[in-house]
Design a protein with these regions (language model features):
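N-terminal phosphate-binding or glycine-rich loops at protein starts, especially the Walker A/P-loop
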Residues: 2-41
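Active-site-proximal region of nucleotide-activated glycan assembly enzymes
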Residues: 122-171
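Conserved nucleotide-sugar phosphate-binding/catalytic loop shared by glycosyltransferases and other
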Residues: 33-81, 88
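Short, well-structured alpha-helical segments in soluble
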Residues: 84-97
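An aromatic- and histidine-rich active-site surface loop
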Residues: 102-119
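Helix N-cap/beta->alpha junction signal
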Residues: 13, 106, 156-158
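Structural motif
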Residues: 6, 99-100
Length: 171
């Protein structure tokens, strides 16, 4: 009997969790896969409603929580939060030893998650690479995540082309 493949999914906001919901359900429905859900960012913030509770109410087990948000959204605050996140994700991945880390989007929490996965040698799958958010730091983070990722799930041919322009193979 082969062992179950561990799929670590990172979620940091209610908006991106909504997009991940059916993917999480699909992973759980496959007997050869083990969902390892890691919550971080706004999900763990009083200011944003502690939305990890909704994830639990939806029936998902949370494998690990990475509390990384400081109460400051200045450049220094975001930078420090990212550093705290890298430490937390390093601990999470050491404990969980995933076969792959799946993430969606372009938020700075994912930069911490991807950096820790990259250093630990865990492959990264990124959903929604190649998209554009003009005038936003999120676009740069999305492109960095695309470069760090081993597997790419894009939403349109235009985004597939952009992923290829970044030197990646979106197949």
């Amino acid at each position: 009997m082969s062992r179950r493949r561990k799929i670590c999914v990172v979620t940091g906001s209610r908006a991106e969790y909504g997009l991940l919901f059916w993917i999480l359900k699909a992973i759980e429905s496959v007997k050869d896969l083990e969902l390892q859900l890691v919550v971080t960012g706004m999900h763990l913030s009083n200011e944003f409603g502690m939305t990890y509770r909704q994830i639990e109410a939806d029936g998902f087990s949370i494998a690990h929580k990475v509390d990384m948000l400081l109460s400051c959204d200045s450049a220094a605050g975001v930078t420090k939060s990212t550093g705290i996140g890298m430490i937390g994700f390093a601990d999470a991945y050491e404990l969980l030893t995933p076969d792959i880390v799946l993430m969606l989007g372009d938020r700075f929490e994912l930069l911490a998650a991807a950096s820790a996965a990259l250093f630990a040698g865990f492959p990264i799958a990124h959903i929604h690479g190649g998209e554009v958010t003009l005038g936003s730091m999120d676009e740069t983070i999305r492109h960095v995540l695309t470069k760090m990722s081993h597997f790419h799930f894009v939403a349109a041919e235009e985004y597939r082309t952009r992923v290829m322009q970044l030197g990646e193979d979106p197949t």
